[in-house]
A protein has these predicted regions:
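Conserved N-terminal structural module of periplasmic/extracytoplasmic solute-binding proteins
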Residues: 10, 18-117, 137, 334-337, ...
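Extracytoplasmic/periplasmic substrate-binding proteins
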Residues: 40-50, 57-60, 66, 72, ...
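Helix-loop-helix "hinge/cap" segment bordering the ligand-binding cleft or interdomain interface
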Residues: 77, 133-135, 148-222, 236-271, ...
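Short helix-initiation/N-cap motifs at beta->coil->alpha
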Residues: 86-95, 114, 190-195, 271-285
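Hinge/lid segment of periplasmic solute-binding proteins
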Residues: 88, 111-165, 174-176, 194, ...
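Short helices/loops that flank or line small-molecule/ion binding pockets
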Residues: 93-105, 122, 173, 197-203, ...
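Periplasmic-binding protein-like
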Residues: 170-172, 207, 344-367
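Long, aromatic- and glycine/proline-rich binding clefts that accommodate carbohydrate-like moieties
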Residues: 357-414, 428, 440-448
Length: 448
């Protein structure tokens, strides 16, 4: 596969030389300063960031562009441009997989592990152990390195993580007579399933007509991981001992039944099958929704934290979204070398590494320095026992038309629309999601 990519790169270079590369465009390697001109494409989904070390950084684009400019300014072996390209969360496949073997292919990717991990099995993601110094390795938590390795090689560089729970508007709880369920301060609560049902029914019966109790959506795969959390509500692990989905268990079917019942009981905004997560985000930020997904990074959702409460997903479940970097082999050794130098520079420069503070840093040094300034850090730490491994080290999670994330959400949309029964939904999920896993295992190849 790598040799094919080299042929493509060499062929493109030959065509470029024959055609003169177009007026006014300097081909890579033709710098008048004697240094090679190299453009590194760094892609990332558009996301908010909460950076306590530099409040001017409010999103991933600002973070990556600043680091890229600083790296290029100090790099001496080539004239480097870090071309930061953002994409919408729902456009992952078109932004990444469909650009492989094109001029728009990413050299570096920054995003959540739940998407990045799948690319490792394409054979395009390079191991990073040769760029990780002893100092970098010692500064990152051991647990972060563990989830960054496959078959003993480190394919992902951990930067920060976010713990996913739910946030709720206390004012609506109080106005609906649910004062007793409001937590103290920023504690992360747990409610029994009977309590969950009582709370949602009470909200549905007493809220203003244009305000809805709970976020729910099924239009696309945005936020599908949070929907999977609900499938654990009655005790399902959702995977069996062999690593396959087990969504036809009594516990999983009970969770699907509970979810579907919320449509008729008025728990969700109308026609949730036609909504995506960002629709619910807008509803929550405009106080038209009571409970929504939360991880500390989405500061635009709330004003004063004291006005809100926090609770694990039904079944006392939380998840964790590690974010970090990986490097792709597009057939150009120079780009791989520079991409590794970029990551090493980022992790060895406190100004940039400290931008992980605000979320939960993977760096011990950063965590210690900013412990008192990171939103709910101690609460998230105390809640870590409720965090589940939602991916189960599964291949083909994202990145193809038959991936888990491509086939999961249509079944949830059908469930919410009433087009299928919970039992039919469970059978469809098992069939399609396990077919995705089987396909991923069959196609899996690792870069050495």
């Amino acid at each position: 596969m790598r040799e094919l990519r080299r042929v493509i790169v060499l062929f493109a270079a030959a065509v470029c030389l024959l055609s003169g590369c177009g007026a006014g465009v300097r081909p890579e390697g033709a710098s008048g300063q004697g240094k090679q001109d190299v453009t590194i494409i760094l892609k990332a989904p558009a996301q908010e960031m909460n950076c306590v070390s530099n409040p001017e950084i409010t999103n991933t684009q600002a973070f990556l562009e600043r680091v890229g400019q600083a790296f290029a300014a100090q790099y001496e072996d080539a004239n480097v441009t870090i071309d930061v390209k953002m994409f919408a969360l729902a456009d992952e496949v078109s932004a990444i997989t469909e650009t492989f073997d094109t001029e728009d292919a990413p050299d570096i990717l920054y995003e959540g592990y739940f998407n990045m991990a799948g690319y490792i099995h394409t054979g395009r993601v390079v191991p990073l152990d040769d760029m990780i110094t002893d100092a970098i390795r010692a500064d990152i938590y051991d647990s972060a390195w563990t989830i960054s390795r496959t078959n003993g090689n480190t394919y992902m560089m951990p930067f920060l993580t976010m713990q996913n729970i739910l946030i709720y508007n206390k004012a609506y709880f109080r106005s609906c007579g649910l004062d007793s369920y409001c937590g103290e301060g920023t504690e992360i609560q747990n409610w029994t399933m009977d309590e969950w049902t009582e709370i949602l029914d009470t909200l549905a019966a007493n809220l203003p007509e244009d305000v809805h109790p709970l976020a729910m959506y099924g239009k696309n795969n945005q936020g599908d991981t949070h929907i999977m959390s609900y499938l654990r509500a009655f005790g399902s692990e959702i995977f069996d001992a062999d690593g396959n989905f087990d969504l036809e268990s009594p516990e999983a079917v009970q969770a699907l039944t509970w979810l579907q019942s919320g449509v008729e009981r008025g728990w969700y905004p109308p026609h949730p099958e036609n909504l995506e997560m960002k629709d619910c985000s807008e509803l929550f930020s405009t106080k038209k929704l009571v409970l929504y997904n939360f991880n500390g990074a989405n500061k635009s959702l709330y004003d004063d934290l004291s006005n809100y409460g926090f609770v694990n997903y039904p079944g006392d479940v939380a998840t964790s979204f590690p974010n970090g970097f990986e490097i792709f082999d597009n057939g150009d050794d120079a780009k791989i070398r520079i991409a590794k130098a970029f990551l090493r520079y980022l992790y060895e420069t406190p100004e940039w590494l400290e931008l992980s503070a605000g979320n939960i840093p993977m760096s011990k040094t950063v965590s210690k320095k900013y412990a008192g300034q990171i939103t709910m850090l101690s609460d998230f730490a105390a809640n870590s026992s409720h965090v589940v491994d939602f991916m189960n080290n599964s291949p083909n999670w994202q990145g193809s038309s038959d991936s888990v994330r491509s086939v999961f959400y249509p079944h949830i949309a059908d469930l919410l629309a009433g087009r299928v029964t919970p039992e039919e939904c469970a059978a469809g999920l098992n069939a399609d999601c396990n077919a995705a896993l089987a396909s991923g295992r069959e196609r899996s190849v690792l870069h050495q």
